[in-house]
């Protein structure tokens, strides 16, 4: 990130970053998915850091991705898939609890709207 920092110890580097208003936070991510038009890049057990530099947040992902064609159902707990509009049980429960409706009604509305927030808003 900073050129010529080979001689700095990590503590000194952190102190300098704090002086410049840069906060660095480790995120305990289990999986990171990057979706492009053609494929999904799935990082299992990736190292993720959040850098906040004066309000601008940047995420850094380090790891080996597995490439999947878009639309493969490799991950069971995706919040939604593009073709089927399938949602995880957690998503259905969240909508049902927030809107005060049954899970079947929540699932139908999720499939209809394709979005958690829109489903809750429609049901309220």
Swiss-Prot record:
Residues 74-93 have a biased composition (Acidic residues). Residues 53-124 are annotated as: Disordered. Residues 7-74 form the NAC-A/B domain. Coiled coil: none annotated. Keywords: Protein transport, RNA-binding, Transport. Pfam families: NAC. GO terms for biological process: protein transport. The keyword rRNA-binding does not apply. GO terms for molecular function: RNA binding. InterPro entries: NAC_A/B_dom_sf, NAC_arc, Nas_poly-pep-assoc_cplx_dom. The keyword Coiled coil does not apply. It comes from the Archaea. Belongs to the NAC-alpha family. Contacts the emerging nascent chain on the ribosome. Homodimer. Interacts with the ribosome. Binds ribosomal RNA. This is Nascent polypeptide-associated complex protein.
């Amino acid at each position: 990130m900073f050129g010529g920092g080979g001689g700095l110890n990590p503590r000194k580097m952190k102190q300098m970053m704090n002086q410049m208003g840069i906060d660095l936070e480790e995120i305990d991510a289990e999986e990171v998915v990057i979706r492009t038009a053609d494929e999904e890049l799935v990082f299992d057990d990736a190292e993720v850091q959040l850098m906040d530099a004066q309000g601008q947040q940047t995420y850094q992902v380090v790891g080996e991705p597995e490439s999947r064609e878009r639309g493969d159902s490799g991950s069971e707990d995706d919040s939604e898939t593009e073709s089927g509009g399938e949602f995880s049980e957690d998503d259905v429960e969240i909508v049902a609890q927030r809107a005060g409706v049954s899970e079947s009604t929540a699932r139908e509305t999720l499939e209809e709207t394709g979005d958690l927030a829109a489903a809750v808003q429609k049901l309220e």
